[in-house]
């Protein structure tokens, strides 16, 4: 009955790209605007927070525009691996922490980034 919809799967991947890019752009802006304050909250050097914000923003733009799409998706997946590792290893946060932000959303963004990496090619593929 719905088998004919598979011809439109590119629309679903594009919608995923837009949503993932929007999330990463929104989360990159505080790192770009106030890296010193974010660094204190994250326990990272301010230069690393600024670099993280640049990677998140540039990769998100690449994902939504389809420029170096696979590279951008891979970079965002790496960011999420780092976020998950930090939450589990350094901060000892559980998957769904009632008093903190757990890492379930990070895992979802990691999976979405990998779906984009494996299923899509953009204007300038890499």
Which stretches of residues belong to each language-model region?
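Extended, low-polarity transmembrane helix blocks
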Residues: 1-40, 46-54, 58, 65-126
């Amino acid at each position: 009955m719905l088998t004919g919809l598979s011809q439109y799967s590119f629309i679903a991947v594009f919608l995923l790209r837009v949503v993932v890019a929007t999330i990463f752009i929104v989360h990159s802006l505080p790192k770009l605007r106030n890296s010193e304050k974010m660094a204190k909250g994250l326990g990272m050097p301010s230069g690393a927070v600024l670099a993280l914000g640049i990677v998140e923003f540039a990769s998100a733009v690449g994902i939504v525009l389809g420029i170096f799409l696979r590279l951008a998706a891979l970079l965002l997946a790496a960011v999420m691996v780092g976020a998950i590792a930090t939450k589990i290893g350094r901060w000892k946060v559980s998957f769904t922490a009632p008093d903190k932000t757990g890492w379930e959303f990070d895992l979802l963004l990691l999976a979405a980034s990998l779906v984009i990496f494996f299923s899509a090619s953009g204007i300038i593929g890499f």
